[in-house]
């Protein structure tokens, strides 16, 4: 927050147009020069739907949420710097503080990861509670825990990707239970372009 105005940047420094509803709520929440580390997110939405709601105002835009992971402050550990503001003053809350759980054993971490995966999250992040905030760098004190499983599914269709994936295939598959989902196949640009052009062969 600078001079009473709220700004948002991507990790690469690109300015993001903050949705009005979130901007107004952040104004009420933040003090001058406060800085948050977070992302625009709605649980259950895919990345393309979120990007679409940010870039072009539509019926989804006011449903976007801003999830806060951290509050960068030099020379303060995560435990001492993390946001402890009262959010009850906001009537229609689109600002979410990401829950932090303390674990001291590997077994506890694995159980917690399974818990969140069952709730349809990709995985969990592990952070050193005594770590300092690092700007622009991927920190050793902040690691992603993400489980990978291989399964085979029937391909029932596909579509062309958009943006950077324009011309590249995105397959539609189906599980044994009849649940349909989109998946991006492994392969380079040329491989996925060939797959899209020959979609009827799959």
Where are these regions (language model features)?
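Nucleic-acid 5′ end/cap handling module spanning
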Residues: 1-14, 56, 74, 91-202
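Covalent nucleotidyltransferase
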Residues: 1-96
